[in-house]
Amino acid sequence: MENSRIRITQITARSVFVPYEAPLGPYIGRRRVGRGPGTLGASALIVRIDSDAGITGWGEGTGELASDVAKRLTGVDACSIESVLALMREVGVAPGPASGVEMALWDLQGKAAGLPVCRLLGGRLRERAEFTACMGIKEPSESADTARVYHERWGFTSIKTKAGEDAELDLAIAEAIVREVGDRAQLRPDANSGYDAAVTP
């Protein structure tokens, strides 16, 4: 395959901070993520991979990518993604930044092949995919208000909430959301295996 001779010439990674627009907020529990008092947002790592073919791939991850790791990947076959992942595991790159590198490599490979990445990964399964709004654990009334805004302002028809800390609170949150949005949006509580057999019916 012609693309297999494409080599990485440079990897750059930059941390960015994206402030949340209310009512968006921290997804996991009640943690506050931000810069300065009252600023809520999300940090991300934007990865750019340049190649000797003049093609650039972009990816998004989390954490930091050490400059020595980026230098070590220079010259590696950009289309041998498994080899790059193995090399990153070997030198101890955390999953967050590694995912950004992998995403950028897939983007680069798709551009080189003139194909959407979904084709490289086996083909399109469906024409449309439902996008789910996610919220952390909030008080029931706040959860209901957030669900309403997600649905009315942004058109979400699927809403995911965190759960698992307190089954009674989780039930109260679910009931409040259902009262607020009814059957206009599907509720998807996610307890992350937080319930034991005694709590789960």
Show which residues each predicted segment covers.
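N-terminal amphipathic alpha-helix/helix-capping segment at the start of soluble metabolic enzymes
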Residues: 2-10, 14, 111, 115-126
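Broad gene-expression machinery/nucleic-acid interaction feature
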Residues: 44-46, 100, 130, 158
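Glycine-rich, flexible loop/turn motifs
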Residues: 20, 69, 84, 116-117, ...
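Metal- or metallocofactor-binding catalytic centers and their adjacent structured scaffolds
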Residues: 10-12, 48-113
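Metal-dependent enolase-superfamily TIM-barrel catalytic cores that perform enediolate-based chemistry
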Residues: 122-201
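Structured beta-strand/loop patches that form or line metal/cofactor-binding pockets in enzymes
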Residues: 2-56, 68
